[in-house]
C-alpha cells in the first residue's frame, strides 16, 4: 500500500519537476493580470525569489527549461523565502519536505498573494 502511494506521489512530483517553466510562466502572468496586477510585478517576484534578472529569465524562457533546471540554475534563492508560509494547492508550503517542490510552491504562493492584492513589501517579507 505505502509503496503504491509513494510511487503515485513520486510520479506526480516528477510531472511537475519536468514541466517547462516557459509553459507555466504565461499562466502566472495571466493570473496576475486578471486581478489587475502586471507582468512586471510577476517578474519582480521571480527575480526576488530566484536571483534571475531580465536577461537570464528570458534565456530560461527561450531555452524551455524545466522547473528542476530553472531552480537548479537559479543564481540565488532569496533567504527570506523561508518566511513564506500558508497553503497552496492543498499543502502548507512550510511543511513540504522535498526542497524542489517547496521552491516551486514558494513561487506559486507569492504569485497567488500578488493576485489576491497583497502589497509587494508584504509578499517580499519586508514588513
Q: At which residue positions do the language-model features occur?
A:
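A charge-rich, low-complexity, intrinsically flexible signal that marks solvent-exposed coils, linkers
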Residues: 10-127
